[in-house]
């Protein structure tokens, strides 16, 4: 948990 969360937030933040 950490990298996946960062990537998920980055994609959802688009």
UniProtKB/Swiss-Prot annotation:
Q: State the GO CC annotations.
A: extracellular region; plasma membrane
* Locations listed in the record: Cell membrane; Secreted
Record text on subunit structure and interactions: Interacts (mainly via CDR1-like domain) with dimeric IgA. Interacts (mainly via CDR2-like domain) with pentameric IgM. Either free or part of the secretory IgA (sIgA) complex that consists of two, four or five IgA monomers, and two additional non-Ig polypeptides, namely the JCHAIN and the secretory component (the proteolytic product of PIGR). Free secretory component interacts with bacterial antigens toxA of C.difficile and eaeA of E.coli.
Q: Where are the transmembrane segments?
A: none
Q: What name goes with this protein?
A: Polymeric immunoglobulin receptor
* Modifications made to the protein after synthesis: N-glycosylated. N-glycosylation is required for anchoring IgA molecules to mucus, but is not necessary for Ig binding.
Instruction: Reply yes or no: does the keyword Disulfide bond apply.
Output: no
Determine the domain of life of the protein's source. Eukaryota
């Amino acid at each position: 948990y950490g990298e996946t969360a960062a990537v998920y937030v980055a994609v959802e933040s688009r």
